[in-house]
Amino acid sequence: MSYKELSTILKVLSDPSRLEILDLLSCGELCACDLLEHFQFSQPTLSHHMKSLVDNELVTTRKNGNKHMYQLNHEFLDYINQNLDIINTSDQGCACKNMKSGEC
């Protein structure tokens, strides 16, 4: 994952409501109406947040009759965590490996 891609995901995650939606979905699949009951915002606002989460692969969606069901995309969230771990280590993939320190 590139820095630009990771930055885009982190921007999506920087919204407190979206983080709370992910937390609610950590308990399992929920429909939009269940999510909406938890928040004090309108259905269009929820739709905006869900579109962002789905478009960025953090959440998956499926239709169940006339309901939209949402669940966490655990595989992609694990992938994001792996990429954040790379930034937090000094392994071979680290950008600092090509730097010569103390030669300014």
UniProtKB/Swiss-Prot annotation:
A GO BP annotation: response to arsenic-containing substance
All copies of domain HTH arsR-type, residue ranges: 1-92
Pfam families linked to this entry: HTH_5
Swiss-Prot/TrEMBL keywords: Arsenical resistance, DNA-binding, Plasmid, Repressor, Transcription, Transcription regulation
DNA-binding region per UniProt: 32-51
Secreted recorded as keyword: no
InterPro entries in the record: ArsR-like_HTH, ArsR_HTH, HTH_ArsR_DNA-bd_dom, HTH_MetalResp_TranReg, WH-like_DNA-bd_sf, WH_DNA-bd_sf
Function: Transcriptional repressor for the ars operon. ArsR is a trans-acting regulatory protein which controls its own expression. The repressive effect of ArsR is alleviated by oxyions of +III oxidation state of arsenic, antimony, and bismuth, as well as arsenate (As(V)).
Protein name: Arsenical resistance operon repressor
Gene this protein is translated from: arsR
